[in-house]
Amino acid sequence: MKLSPYSRKIILTTFNNWHVDKEFADPMYNYLVFGYSPGSCFTAVLANDFLSAVSRSHPGNTIPAFKALAGWIRDTVPAQARGSYEAVDQWALLGADARRAVLESAGLVLTEDREMWLTLKGEPVVEPVLY
């Protein structure tokens, strides 16, 4: 699914609000928007499998980073895309239009009409910088 900078900003702002590290945010963004696998550790996090998440985690990952990610998932990720391995797998199998409909309903992306309107108006947009 192709997102305008306006919709991209909405999702990136949610990461910024939770202080999610860029190394965590990038795979989660790609999972939500494109249905790409976020990797074994983050798949386990999305599936609520703590033991697998920690055992598959990079040694440099920190508890505060995981806490920020967990808060972001709880507050941001649609229920259809988290909670079990089956839900994570089903999200990845959804077509772009179905994923977009869920993300629009969750307020994470704008409708294509709204994106077009903002683009035509030349509305300025500044994406948050993730660290």
PLM regions: where:
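IQ-motif-like calmodulin-binding regions
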Residues: 50
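N-terminal leader regions
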Residues: 3-18, 108-110, 114-118, 124, ...
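Amphipathic alpha-helical binding modules
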Residues: 62-121
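N-terminal low-complexity, intrinsically disordered segments
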Residues: 1-45, 55, 61-88
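A signal for specific C-terminal beta-sheet/loop modules enriched in small/flexible residues
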Residues: 56-60, 125-130
